[in-house]
Amino acid sequence: MKKGIIGKKLGMTQIFDEKGNVVPVTLIEAGPCVVAQKKTVENDGYAAIQLAYEDAKKKHLTKAEVGHFEKAGVALKKHLKEFRLEDTSAYEAGSVVTVDTFAAGEKVDITGITKGRGYTGAIKRWNLHKLRMTHGVGPVHRQSGSMGVIDPARIFKNKKMAGQYGNEQVTIQNLFVVKIDAEKNLIAVKGAVPGAKGGIVFVRDSVKA
């Protein structure tokens, strides 16, 4: 990986390309981020930078977090994320990373926390088929069906059942960067991005591009 940045999902809209086609895009307010820590192969065994994003008050942070920022000599921030990079020679503690590190036409991987939908049935959670509505099926029609009554007489782990749906970390790969607005710290990517409006997302160059 060569670059990364922390951002906030603003929502979706649409823009028109040069041929007049409608392109659905997600707007992300990316950065500016501050380098809170730099890791090197010599000292840490791998090369990485730790980015900090969005100003925070001291009362909202732990003593360990406050001490970490004070040691680096940077302002207090809410969010921290480490990005492993091939080369960290261009970064030092206190360096600022902005959205113009990316460019239109590139492909990126974006990680976020999906919307939490609470306790959900197996039909909606796993897209299973409903049971037949007639001919002896009842009184329920939205259950997953038989799970092994006699043999093996138990339910295997990871069986698709009802439970918590959403609120999990998901990465969407190979999203196309349509536009960059360096003045407003905006990046527009084609397609949807996991999470609700205002959710924190991590943008990095694509590993499969």
Language model: regions and residue ranges:
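Extended basic (Lys/Arg/His-rich) segments that typically form rRNA-contacting surfaces
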Residues: 1-209
